[in-house]
Regions:
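Short, charged, low-complexity loops and linkers
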Residues: 2-13, 38-51, 141-146, 181-185
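Short alpha-helical hairpin
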Residues: 2-3, 15-45, 61-65, 131, ...
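Acidic, carboxylate-rich catalytic segments that either coordinate divalent cations
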Residues: 3-4, 200, 204, 209-247
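Active-site-proximal alpha-helical scaffolds that flank and shape metal-associated catalytic sites
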Residues: 12-15, 19-22, 84-188, 233-237, ...
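Alpha-helical bundle segments that constitute or directly flank the non-heme di-iron/ferroxidase center
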Residues: 22-26, 41-75, 146-165, 232-239
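Short, contiguous, pocket-lining structural segments
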Residues: 46-49, 53-60, 78-85, 98-102, ...
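Structural helix-adjacent loops and short alpha-helical linkers that scaffold large soluble proteins
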Residues: 73-77, 117, 177, 217-222
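Glycine/small-residue-rich hydrophobic helix-like segments
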Residues: 182-208
Length: 247
């Protein structure tokens, strides 16, 4: 069992978060998809295919987060104070700017990219894209409690990439700031405290600190580092799949 003091847990998580950020920079940030997006040279067809797959991913990952309360109910009942930070993210995802939440801006940015609501939400995912939500579903359903929470540390580097998306869409692809709001809002939500709530990344780290204080047992093959950095590889595969399918 790995059991740490609060300062030790915070240091451990900071190190893992830094590894996650580095892996993201080494993988996602160096894809042809992101290079061409930042330069305004990514084909619109590729961008649309990415967004259709991303639109199918979003409801899944949000539902996985809400299911965490049921799957990990024993932990939240034992640590009632953490229900507040957990609920902050639920309110953000499903209540801002009003119910049903972020899915509204997901659809509005999709519309600005020339996609219908059905294309954004109901498109079959490419196998290379399907791997990302299936990884999270596997951890929430089959894994130890900490595995899921370590696996969402990638929200912070994703939030930084959202700024790249926002800049590219408004500078090179003719979208207004309102049109591209899915990415600006997620840059804000994932990387900084906002609306008197913790950033999504801070919510995750708060839960992980408590888990490490109370002790975790790792399954063979599912170390904290593996769970934390693998989503960067899967996001790269997601982008590569969309790029290769349109070239």
């Amino acid at each position: 069992m790995l059991k740490l003091s609060e300062p030790q847990a915070k240091e451990y998580i900071a190190e893992l978060a830094a590894k996650c950020d580095r892996r993201w920079k080494e993988t996602v940030d160096k894809t042809r998809f992101m290079d061409e997006l930042r330069a305004g040279k990514l084909k619109k067809e590729t961008l649309q295919l990415f967004y259709k797959n991303w639109g199918s991913f979003v409801p899944v990952i949000n539902s996985v987060y809400t299911s965490a309360f049921y799957r990990h109910l024993w932990f939240f009942v034992k640590n009632v104070d953490l229900m507040e930070v957990y609920t902050q993210k639920v309110l953000d995802e499903f209540g801002h700017p009003c119910p049903p939440g972020h899915i509204q801006i997901l659809m509005s940015t999709g519309k600005a990219l020339g996609l219908s609501k059905e294309e954004v939400l109901l498109s079959p995912m490419l196998p290379e894209c399907r791997a990302l939500p299936d990884f999270h579903r596997t951890l929430i359903n089959d894994g130890q409690i900490q595995e899921y929470w370590f696996s969402v540390l990638w929200e912070h580097p994703f939030g930084e990439s959202c700024l790249d998306f926002f800049k590219a869409l408004t500078m090179h692809y003719g979208l207004s700031t309102a049109d591209a709001s899915y990415f600006s809002k997620h840059h804000e939500a994932d990387t900084m405290d906002h609306l008197d709530r913790k950033s999504h990344g801070a919510v995750t780290q708060t839960v992980l600190v408590r888990l490490l204080q109370q002790g975790i047992i790792e399954r063979p093959g599912y170390s904290a580092e593996y769970c934390a950095v693998t989503p960067a590889d899967l996001n790269k595969m997601f982008m590569d799949g969309c790029y290769n399918a349109t070239h």
